[in-house]
Amino acid sequence: MTKATDIRTKTPDELNDMLLELKREQLNLRFQRATGQQENTSQIRKARRDVARVKTIQAERARAAAKA
């Protein structure tokens, strides 16, 4: 799980890369769940929340740029 303070230090390009990586992780976790290979089901929730954190910070930056 990534903290919001760690995410805020990243550049926009790093955020996009991080978002793509998290989406891939979500996809892999969904496949593992569907095939019955997943042992730790809380990983899906953690990945989903990390995606939400990244998107929230991207939206905050977009709003700040629009105001400026």
Swiss-Prot record:
NCBIfam families cross-referenced by the UniProt entry: L29
Chain segments annotated as transmembrane: none
Coiled coil: none
Covalent S-S links between cysteines: none
UniProt KW Coiled coil keyword: no
Official protein name in the record: Large ribosomal subunit protein uL29
Cellular component aspect of the GO annotation: cytosolic large ribosomal subunit
GO molecular function: structural constituent of ribosome
Pfam family, one: Ribosomal_L29
UniProt record similarity statement: Belongs to the universal ribosomal protein uL29 family.
Alphabetical list of InterPro entries matching this protein: Ribosomal_protein_uL29 (IPR050063), Ribosomal_uL29 (IPR001854), Ribosomal_uL29_CS (IPR018254), Ribosomal_uL29_sf (IPR036049)
Keywords (A to Z) from UniProt: Ribonucleoprotein, Ribosomal protein
Domain of life: Bacteria
GO BP: any one term: translation
Lineage of the species this protein comes from: Bacteria, Pseudomonadati, Pseudomonadota, Alphaproteobacteria, Acetobacterales
